[in-house]
C-alpha cells in the first residue's frame, strides 16, 4: 500500500497545485490580515525579493528557522528542501539535482586528491571548507536567514558552487538590549544549551552581539570505544560568535561590522556500523575533530544616491583531525591531520540610476594554504601534502528594465585559479602546478505582466576546477583530472494572489555537463577521478505556500529529476544514472498557531528510489522511503516551550550503501523526541 501511495505522490501534489490555482479567483475578495512572509534573497550579492528571484530557492527566516525546537543545523533545513538528498554528518555532502555536493572525491580519495566540493556553504560571507561542512555542525542558533539556492552559482561564487549554494546569515547587534537562553533535552542523550545577549556600547553608534551554543548527542550505532578516540559515539559541537556593529549617528550612510566566529565539532566519520566481519571495516570507527576560527570585516558606504561601496575582508584558520588506530597498532588504521589558513578580499560597487538601470561590479581575491598528512600502509605509510590555492576574479551584473513589465539581467565572471599540490610518500609523489582562466556568463529575461505574476528564462555557465591525486588501492598510481563545466537553462514562474495569502512557484531546468568529474575504477579498491564527456540532468521544482486562515499555514513542494551519464567511454557506467538522484522528492508541511499562543505543526517528506552511486549496483539500490515529523509548542510573552518528535513512526530504511555489502548501510536516524525551552529577555 505504501509503495502505491508513493508512486501516486507526484500526481497528488500536482492536483494540489491545480486546486490552489482555482483558489485564486476569489482571493481578492477574501483578503485577510495575515499574509505570507515577504522574504529577501541576498545570496546573489544583491537584495532581491524571493518572488522576483529567478534562481530556484528555499528561504528559511526568523522565527521559522526552528519552530520545532529541534532544527539545530543547516542539514535539518536541507532535508526539507526538494531535489536535495542530505545524509547528515559524514563523508557525503548533500546532492542537489543529482549532483554530489562533495565533489568527485570523499574519504581517503579526498585526502590524496584534495577536496573540490560542488556545494558552497557560507556563513556571514565566509565559505566553509569541505571538512567543516561534512563533519561539523552549521548551527542555526541566532541565525537571521538561511537560503538554499539550487543550480550553478559559479557566476556569483566562482569555484565550488557548481551544484548550488547554502547562504547563512546571522543576526546583527541591536541598539536596544535583548537576550535569550535556550535549553534542550531529548533521547539519544541529546543536550542543547544556547544563549545570546545584544545591546549598545555607545547608544546609536556602536553595538555588540555575543552568542554561544553547545550541542551534544550520542550516535545510535553501537561503536566501540578505543584509544585515541575514546567514545566514537559522542557527537558534539560548540559555536561562539561575537559581533561589533558601528553605525555612526552623524554618518547614517555608513556602517562597519566585525564578526568573530569559533567552531569546534567532533563526530564519527559516518553513522554506518559496517560489516565488521569483513576485511573492509574495522570495528573501531574513525572520529573527525574539526575546528575553525575566523574574522570577517564588512564595510558599507552609500556614496550618493546612485553609488554604494561594500568591502569584505575574511581571514580564517582551520584544523581537522581524523582520529584512528595508528599503523603500529593496526595496518588498517588511517589517522590523518589537516591544517590551513585562508584570506579573502572582495570590494563591490553597487550602482542604480533610480530608474531603468541597476547593478554591481566587483573584485574577488582568495588565497589558501594547507598542510596535510595521512598514514596509510598501502601507499607507503605516511604521506604529506602541501596544497595552495589562489583565485582572482572580476564580476559584474547589470539589470536593464526597458519597461515596467520587462527586466533583462546580464552577468559575468572572469576567474583565474592557480592550484599547487605536492607531496606523497617515498613510493609515489604528486606535483601539480596548474592554472586556468574561465569566463562564466549569465543571462536572465523576466516578464512581469502584473504585480502578481513573474515569468522568465535564464541561462548560465558553471564550472569546478580540476586536480590530481593518488590511488590508495592496487594498482597504486598518480593521476590528474580536468575542470568540469555545465550549461544551465531554466524557465521559472512565480504567482501570488492579490491578498498575498497564496504563492506558487516553479522552475524547470536542463543541465548539460561537459567533462563532469566522476570516479573511474581501476580495480576493486583502486579508484581515480576522470572526466565524463557528457552528463545530462533535467527536472523541476514546484512549491506552494498558502496562508489558509489567520492561524493555519500549509506548504508543499515537489522535485522531479532525471539524470544520465551520456558519454563516459570504458568506464562501465556510461548510460547510468547519477548517485543519490531520486526521480522525485516531495514534502507537505502544516503550521497552526492560534491567538492564545498554542502551536502545532509538522511535515511529511517523501523520497523516490535511487542508486547510492553512479555504478548503479543493485546492492546499492535504495527503495522509496518517507518520514513524518511533528511538534507542538506554547508561546508566551517572554519565551516558548516546544515538544518534538522526528521520524514519528521510527522508519529505519537504508538511505545509502557505501559498498557492495548491504550490511554497510546508512539508515534513517531512529525516532528522536525531546523538549526545548527558550526564554527571552
Give, region by region, the residue ranges found by the protein language model:
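Transmembrane beta-barrel wall of Gram-negative outer-membrane proteins
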Residues: 178-180, 185-217, 221-267, 291-297, ...
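N-terminal Sec signal peptide and the immediately downstream disordered periplasmic leader
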Residues: 1-85, 111, 198, 253-256, ...
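Acidic, small-polar-rich N-terminal luminal/periplasmic segments of exported/outer-membrane proteins
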Residues: 34-176, 491, 659
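Gram-negative outer-membrane beta-barrel transporters
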Residues: 404, 408, 416, 510-512, ...
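Face-selective signature of the C-terminal outer-membrane beta-barrel domain
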Residues: 253-261, 290-324, 332-435, 441, ...
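C-terminal beta-signal and adjacent terminal beta-strands/loops
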Residues: 606-613, 632-681
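Transmembrane beta-strands of outer-membrane beta-barrel pores
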Residues: 183-187, 214-218, 260-266, 315-319, ...
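Membrane-embedded beta-barrel scaffold of Gram-negative outer-membrane proteins
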Residues: 298-302, 306-326, 448, 455-460, ...
Amino acid at each position: 500500500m505504501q509503495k502505491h501511495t508513493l508512486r501516486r505522490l507526484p500526481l497528488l501534489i500536482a492536483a494540489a497545485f491545480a486546486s490552489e490555482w482555482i483558489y485564486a479567483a476569489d482571493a481578492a475578495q477574501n483578503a485577510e490580515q495575515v499574509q505570507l512572509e515577504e522574504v529577501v534573497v541576498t545570496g546573489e550579492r544583491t537584495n532581491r525579493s524571493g518572488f522576483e528571484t529567478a534562481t530556484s530557492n528555499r528561504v528559511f527566516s526568523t522565527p521559522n528557522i526552528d519552530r520545532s525546537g529541534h532544527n539545530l543545523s543547516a542539514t535539518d533545513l536541507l532535508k526539507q528542501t526538494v531535489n536535495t538528498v542530505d545524509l547528515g554528518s559524514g563523508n557525503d555532502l548533500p546532492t542537489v539535482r543529482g549532483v554530489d555536493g562533495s565533489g568527485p572525491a570523499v574519504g581517503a580519495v579526498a585526502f590524496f586528491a584534495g577536496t573540490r566540493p560542488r556545494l558552497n556553504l557560507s556563513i556571514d560571507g565566509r565559505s566553509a571548507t569541505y571538512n567543516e561542512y561534512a563533519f561539523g555542525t552549521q548551527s542555526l542558533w541566532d541565525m537571521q536567514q538561511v537560503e538554499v539556492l539550487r543550480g550553478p552559482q559559479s557566476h556569483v561564487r566562482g569555484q565550488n558552487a557548481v551544484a548550488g549554494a547554502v547562504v547563512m546569515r546571522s543576526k546583527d547587534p541591536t541598539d536596544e538590549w535583548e537576550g535569550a537562553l535556550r535549553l534542550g533535552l531529548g533521547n539519544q542523550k541529546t543536550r542543547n544549551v544556547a544563549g545570546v545577549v545584544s545591546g549598545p556600547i555607545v547608544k546609536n553608534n556602536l553595538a555588540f552581539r555575543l552568542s554561544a551554543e553547545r550541542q551534544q548527542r550520542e550516535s545510535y550505532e553501537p561503536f566501540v570505544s578505543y584509544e585515541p578516540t575514546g567514545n566514537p559515539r559522542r557527537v558534539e559541537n560548540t559555536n561562539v560568535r561575537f559581533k561589533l556593529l558601528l553605525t555612526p549617528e552623524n554618518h547614517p550612510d555608513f556602517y562597519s561590522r566585525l564578526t568573530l566566529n569559533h567552531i569546534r565539532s567532533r563526530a564519527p566519520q559516518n553513522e554506518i556500523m559496517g560489516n565488521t566481519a569483513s576485511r573492509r571495516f574495522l570495528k573501531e570507527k574513525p572520529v573527525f575533530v574539526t575546528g575553525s576560527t575566523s574574522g570577517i570585516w564588512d564595510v558599507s558606504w552609500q556614496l550618493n544616491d546612485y553609488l554604494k561601496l561594500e568591502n569584505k575582508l575574511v581571514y580564517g584558520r582551520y584544523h581537522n583531525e581524523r582520529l584512528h588506530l595508528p599503523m603500529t597498532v593496526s595496518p588498517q588504521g588511517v589517522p590523518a591531520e589537516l591544517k590551513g589558513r585562508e584570506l579573502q578580499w572582495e570590494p563591490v560597487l553597487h550602482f542604480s540610476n533610480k530608474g531603468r538601470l541597476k547593478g554591481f561590479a566587483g573584485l574577488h581575491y582568495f588565497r589558501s594554504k594547507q598542510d596535510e598528512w595521512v598514514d596509510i600502509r598501502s601507499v607507503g605509510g605516511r604521506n604529506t601534502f602541501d596544497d595552495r590555492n589562489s583565485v582572482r576574479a572580476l564580476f559584474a551584473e547589470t539589470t536593464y528594465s526597458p519597461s515596467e513589465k520587462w527586466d533583462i539581467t546580464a552577468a559575468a565572471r572572469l576567474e583565474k585559479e592557480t592550484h599547487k599540490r605536492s607531496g606523497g610518500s617515498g613510493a609515489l609523489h604528486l606535483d601539480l602546478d596548474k592554472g586556468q582562466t574561465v569566463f562564466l556568463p549569465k543571462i536572465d529575461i523576466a516578464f512581469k505582466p502584473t504585480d502578481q505574476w513573474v515569468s522568465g528564462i535564464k541561462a548560465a555557465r558553471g564550472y569546478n576546477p580540476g586536480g590530481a591525486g593518488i590511488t590508495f588501492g592496487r594498482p597504486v598510481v598518480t593521476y590528474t583530472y580536468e575542470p568540469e563545466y555545465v550549461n544551465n537553462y531554466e524557465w521559472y514562474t512565480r504567482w501570488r494572489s492579490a491578498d498575498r495569502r497564496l504563492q506558487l512557484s516553479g522552475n524547470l531546468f536542463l543541465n548539460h555537463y561537459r567533462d563532469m568529474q566522476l570516479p573511474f575504477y581501476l580495480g576493486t579498491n583502486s579508484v581515480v577521478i576522470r572526466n565524463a564527456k557528457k552528463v545530462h540532468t533535467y527536472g523541476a521544482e514546484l512549491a506552494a505556500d498558502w496562508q489558509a486562515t489567520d492561524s493555519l499555514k500549509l506548504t508543499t513542494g515537489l522535485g522531479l529529476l532525471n539524470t544520465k551519464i551520456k558519454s563516459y567511454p570504458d568506464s562501465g557506467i556510461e548510460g547510468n544514472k547519477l548517485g543519490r538522484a531520486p526521480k522525485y522528492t516531495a514534502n507537505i508541511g502544516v503550521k497552526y498557531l492560534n491567538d492564545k499562543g498554542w502551536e502545532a505543526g509538522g511535515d511529511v517528506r517523501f523520497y523516490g528510489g535511487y542508486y547510492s552511486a553512479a555504478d548503479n549496483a543493485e546492492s546499492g539500490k535504495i527503495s522509496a522511503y518517507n518520514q513524518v515529523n511533528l511538534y507542538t509548542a506554547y508561546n508566551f510573552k517572554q519565551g516558548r516551550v516546544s515538544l518534538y518528535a522526528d521520524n514519528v513512526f521510527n522508519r529505519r530504511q537504508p538511505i545509502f550503501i557505501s559498498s557492495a555489502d548491504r550490511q554497510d548501510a546508512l539508515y534513517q536516524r531512529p525516532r528522536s523526541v525531546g523538549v526545548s525551552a527558550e526564554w527571552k529577555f
